[in-house]
């Protein structure tokens, strides 16, 4: 229940809008759609048996769907729907904070890797400010969050400095294990998108979205879990599970 309450706070709806200029016709092959009985999340395939997402996506009856572009289209040809064995969130994650908002999902069976389903590369070095990143997730263009999102979109935005991020989010504690990506001041138009969008920078998965006041697909500043910081934890979980 606490996870659902946090999720509701992260997904308060205003008017909904989307930008067709950002719509893409095919899914980044690492991108995973996590469907639940509440609201969906994005995830990233990092191993044939493991998906990484935000810890606030620990939601009821989660279903892992790979190779999907439009979730509402049941006729897509390259879907893989896989059950999960367990969800492991970071031990320091708390529902009262956006810090350590990261979780691993172990699949029941290995994903079949092909042209439409591939692994994302994990980073083994950090990145500097002004690095350009590609952020992808699904967007709603109707005022009904209980329907499936209508379009998959990608936007290219850059990493900003910690001082800029702290200025954008004065009431949040921006720690060294967070990454901020977007344009300041942002909040240019209302929107609604699927949470936990990944940030791919220089071909590496550098961030998983924890929170944004607005929408990252509109280049509003998002606060991401910095994946590089969590590499030891990720490797340990996969090795021991």
Curated annotation (Swiss-Prot):
Superkingdom of this protein's organism:
Eukaryota
Query: Main localization of the protein?
Result: secreted
Stated EC number for the protein is: 3.4.21.4
Name the glycosylated positions: 156, 173
- Pfam short name (any one): Trypsin
Instruction: List the catalysed reactions.
Output: Preferential cleavage: Arg-|-Xaa, Lys-|-Xaa
Q: What class of enzyme is it?
A: hydrolase
> One cellular component GO annotation, for this chain's record?
extracellular space
* SMART domains for the chain: Tryp_SPc
Q: Does the keyword Signal apply?
A: yes
Signal peptide start-end: 1-17
Give every Peptidase S1 domain span: 18-239
Checking PANTHER family in the record gives:
KALLIKREIN-RELATED, SERINE PROTEASE 58
- For this entry, the protein name equals Serine protease 58
Taxonomy of the source species: Eukaryota, Metazoa, Chordata, Craniata, Vertebrata
């Amino acid at each position: 229940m606490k996870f659902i309450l946090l999720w509701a706070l992260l997904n308060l709806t205003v008017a909904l809008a989307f930008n067709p200029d950002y719509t893409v016709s095919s899914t980044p092959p690492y991108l995973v759609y996590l469907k639940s009985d509440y609201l969906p999340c994005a995830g990233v395939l990092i191993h044939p048996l493991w998906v990484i997402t935000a810890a606030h996506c620990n939601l009821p009856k989660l279903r892992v769907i790979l190779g999907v572009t439009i979730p509402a289209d049941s006729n897509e040809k390259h879907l893989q729907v896989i059950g999960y064995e367990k969800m492991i969130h970071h031990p320091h994650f708390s529902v009262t904070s956006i810090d350590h908002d990261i979780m691993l999902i172990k699949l029941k069976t290995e994903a079949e890797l092909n042209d439409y389903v591939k692994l994302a590369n994990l980073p083994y070095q950090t990145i500097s400010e002004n690095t350009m990143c590609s952020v992808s997730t699904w967007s709603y263009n109707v005022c009904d969050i209980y329907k499936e999102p209508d379009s998959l979109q990608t936007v290219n935005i850059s990493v900003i400095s910690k001082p800029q991020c702290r200025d954008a989010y004065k009431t949040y504690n921006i720690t060294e294990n967070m990454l901020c990506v977007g344009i300041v001041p942002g909040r240019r138009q209302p929107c609604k998108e699927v949470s936990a969008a990944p940030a791919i920078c220089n071909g590496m998965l550098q961030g998983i979205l924890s929170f944004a006041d607005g929408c990252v697909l509109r280049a509003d500043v998002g606060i991401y879990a910095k994946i590089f910081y969590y590499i030891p934890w990720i490797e340990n979980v996969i090795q021991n599970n």
